[in-house]
């Protein structure tokens, strides 16, 4: 079911206005439906039955009201059936006989296969709602219930009956959660929990507000405050309870608690109060632990950066040369030395100089780390107390425990017997140093960096965390995988044996390597120590395209942003999707728009209130809190994209299965703990990673930390879009790794990276393969096919876990990044990824059309980023950037605003082209395909916003009493 169809489900009567697309979708009939219609006697009966069939297909309900029947629909039905449409009054007169109305309703149900819900199906619906209740509010559950009924060919019942089922599901969830809490937590502890959240702190704020607050920065003081929160939660024994309650349920009740002022908590009745408080404290422990680990990782990175800043970038060869010259001068000054002895001394000096190896920069940085460890020792003392876990023995945990024991003794000298070889040979010399105080500092640094690496690859974890749990949590359990593996292999369309998968891939790699060698022989490619590819020539602007663009701009004209939003909403009804129903008033509709604009532009709630005089800043803040919940904005964004792709012009823009993804940095302030310094603009920023279709439009957006690998986010955006099929995703260098290329292929699509570094353009073939001499410098025969075959099942196991939603691609790629080197699954994925990269690069090197295609789709991503920058012109406020869910709302709202602008431009361009086509003025598709829907020149994004709602009331607010009625009323 498409997103745009959802808004029609459950409608009680026909809308006052219906588009041509909707009439064709719902009121066009196939053979069996036509036979049933033509079996009726009389044109009125035929039209009436056709109306019932179309309405049931559109809304899932039976049509019982005939107050409004649009003229266009009545005319369309007549043309569809080839009969003259009579007056609507005759239809109403016919249905005054109840038997006729009932008969037509029953025939419509029979033809479309609908039936009334049975008691068994009602219980199934309650179970479905029970599964969805943790992640949805009441209005969204109402939509899910209607979708479930429609998909199962059940007539959608009255809204009141569905809301009764929703209330029962919510009550059942609350009772089950309350029972589980009461069974695992003693009453005295629950009393302590309830009392603790309402206690006042010395600064006047409640414990509830303090626990929920996000850190301002990643400073030592902020880390200490986060540790203080964890200590408080440990004091309350939160870490000992509620381990069996799912994370989604914890999140639901925690967010419900913080949505109200702390003073309102006393008014909440039991067991709801206990459920909310318990889930809130447990969820706070999860999020605070994640914050601590991220801040510690950032602090360690800062420690390395500060040490590296004091070390010269390269070896000072000039100083070494001067030293050698000085020694030579000293020898030559000794005139009394015989020539033979002088020659021997010179040879010895040269030999000694050649053996003298300057220290590497990394070793100098490590020495600087050892010297500078004291300022972060208190941090190491604190994190040593946390309950770190590992599968089996792990050196990071072992030596963290030894350091903790030494801290408790107050000792700052390392015992002689501690040499810590398992922490790595690079630290061995420093830890074995005779200076045991310095050896102690070296052990601290080695343990700190070993812990950082282990947390990144998932070999060490903390159980009460959302993002840093063990790597085993990424996979299905072994029992489940053994039972369901065949189903997942089939779902991923993968063979059970790696050899079957590798055979066509190896043939493609061999053919690709031969093609690259042929291109090198012909001079198309230049190979020395690296492979050099000539840049594609820039495309010249076609004068006909410029002329067409100017003509379209002239016909479309200028418009205000409110007009654009209303025009798109009238077609898509994204406000209905966000609300889960029709807006009840104009003010509620404006609050939806204000919530989108306050998140999707740099306007604050106060500034939005100035631009929308009908609303207050308080109501806009309320709309912002509501809009960012439960991914409402992303659902609306998806619906607008579907509307945009329906236009015929979209087919001229490119392929439907090709997309690109890229990150855009958004400036913020230093008082945001997840902000990183943008290397280009040297400002604190947060990244927003967006996926753009080749046919334009954003289909996924996600906030991301700058300077991190983006491959996981790139993959996540594709696999979470079930309605869009993407076979190739173009990314830049930061959006790929070898493991990510193999993971993406197992998930059903190809990563196509535009590689910046020449070293990344090397080709790889299996061991023992003969490499053509022309490309021997850039082709390595070191791929271990046997390793891929050995761990094939584990690679598919991980892909199936990600595809099913058991784990996210972001988490999987974070655990299987460079920190996982040496892990057999990681190494197998890298080997497979190198083969896939070779096959891709071979096409990229020799096929200019393929290169042009990737350049085009990546440029479209950049153009969309430019559009988003024009919409969001300022900084992201600290209030919106401190929590992931708030940043997700910014990303989704900005994508929605950009999609609205592109959808409006698309519809206007299509309307102009249709008018020209009606006048037999045909425009070649190759010219239309070069006109982008990202124009902003004629759209005013600023000023006082006046929304002409009355102009679009028939489509957006059809049930409003004072809305003008369009259509035929008899």
Curated annotation (Swiss-Prot):
Any one Gene Ontology molecular-function term assigned to this protein's record: transposase activity
BP GO annotations: DNA transposition
UniProt entry keywords in alphabetical sequence: DNA recombination, DNA-binding, Transposable element, Transposition
Organism domain of life: Bacteria
Function: Required for transposition of transposon Tn5271.
Protein family per UniProt: Belongs to the transposase 7 family.
Name assigned to this protein: Transposase for insertion sequence element IS1071 in transposon Tn5271
Source organism (scientific name): Comamonas testosteroni (Pseudomonas testosteroni)
